[in-house]
């Protein structure tokens, strides 16, 4: 079993009416960060192909609306609405603790030295298929605006009707 520190980042967006085009969210401003730890265990004693990869990560997912909008919790729904103030920043952030699990195919070869076989890892192409499950443990909205030269920043914490349990499929 080997361990590995994980740091990942990328872009977030939502599919609306079957497309990402004309999104309600900024393409480059909506992104995610992830950091965590994974463990990789070879499944077969005498073969290096199959590994079980598992661990934990903390994920920060940000959505930044377009056109001076912000998220408004209307009871059972959270809607995007135009804010009467001119905002310099509007962002909804979900922070999740996730447990990823993957079946990894590692095509690294083996080395034989002094009649002992050593299985190399991470020396060749790898492919992982699996999924993740986790908990949302914080949702907050950050808005920044300026009124008559006074810069303000408001942070509102709440559920914003986000799911407490998250899950999904993933590949790498």
Regions found by a protein language model. Name each.
Residues 38-40, 90-92, 102-106, 170-172:
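Transmembrane beta-barrel domains of outer membrane proteins
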Residues 5-9, 52-56, 101, 127-131, ...:
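Membrane-embedded beta-strand positions of outer-membrane beta-barrel proteins
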Residues 9-15, 58-64, 105-109, 131-139:
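Transmembrane beta-strands of outer-membrane beta-barrel pores
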Residues 3, 27-33, 93-99, 123, ...:
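Residues that define the transmembrane beta-barrel architecture of outer-membrane proteins
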Residues 111-142, 156:
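A mid-sequence, solvent-exposed acidic-amphipathic segment
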